[in-house]
Amino acid sequence: MPPRHLIVGGGTAGLNAIRTIREHDSGASEIVLVSAERPYARMVLPYYLGGQISESRVFTATPARLAALRVQVRTGRRALGLDIAANRLRLSDGVLEYDDLLIATGSRPVKPDIPGAEGPAVHSFWTLEQARALVAAIREGAEVVLVGAGFIAFTILNAILALKARLTIVETAPRLLPRMIDDEAAALVAAWLRRRGVALRTGSALAAIEQVGGRARLRLADGETLAAGIVIMATGIQPNIQWLGGSGLRLNRGILVDDHLRASARNVYAAGDVAEGPDVVTGQAAVHAIEPTAMEHGRVAGANMAGRDVRYAGSLLMNIVEACGLDIASFGAWEDADAEVAVASRPERFAYRKLLWRGDRLVGAILVGRSIDVWTTNDLGMLKGLTQAGHGLGRWKAVLCRSPFDLKPAFVGAGSTGRLLPITVLGKPSVAPDEVKAG
């Protein structure tokens, strides 16, 4: 009988695994996709919220496309438990057996444990259903309070402003994007947003939310109160692994996987937000809940499920977001306290570069710059490449430290492009260097 591949989760990781399996087996195996919802792209939900695309554009795999890939689709079902000894997955409506299993169940939003956090004026923005609720709720002139100033909050900031709502951001940490950029970069971002009418409350912990006549009143720990028609919680996410308790899989923050994306059971793989796998810079296990990692994980796991032997070098921690025309990014070990640091700032242009070094190896970077500046866009790609390539830059380190705003000579001179080619080719999984040369 043909092997049965069971994929749990229809997001980026799961769909990339399916496509990769089919690239290698030409339809010879059985693939079953289990998903709570019809597959859609979470990363485009902000564009749906802002009215730039219709809801129909958020979906990523049509029934016809999945049928063409010979995928049996079971939507509207949730995974509830796993028996790795019997190769059985327990669902909300029964049990499925498998030969191998990919767990790609993504993340879920986390709300602070405070009074009023579940009130009618309080929303999250993570699922399509939650996006629909906000599309219906936000109107021009609405008073919106965004609780949290991390990456998730910044992905929806533009959409809220595009709807001509009045926006206030409340953040417990003393700066914006506290898990993504440093104090100096955050100060530039704060100044940029204030110029565009965004009210900021950093260093302000939320104590409670009260419902007053269909509106919300937020009480901060320092006693200040804020009125809002809509409150959006953007206070973090965590991997969807709660249903795996007692399964026997090794769990930490996520599902621990090796360099083949294999979990502690030989025929179980994990990919995307739920996988805790190798970090290309540190070599340590980490959860990187970002789209590029989900894509890479899915392709590597899918190749291995199809019988290939593909090793994953590791994912690069990176976050890139654009806020009102300002690009903000960080890569790798951007907060390494023991790293050697080179910094350049042009505050009048809202431009900032920070490079972090271990020896002559670039291990982390922060970038801030206006989107209209072409060199900002170019530098984003080159900083990512220099960090991900992971090789010593030799004499080019001194060049970069002298001129952090001029990356191209070092990127080209150090041969970073050639070193990146064996790591990833157009988003596909790693291939052996001899295969690259042969091509």
Which residues are covered by each model-predicted region?
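FAD-site-proximal beta/loop scaffold in flavoenzymes
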Residues: 118-142, 213, 217-219, 224-300
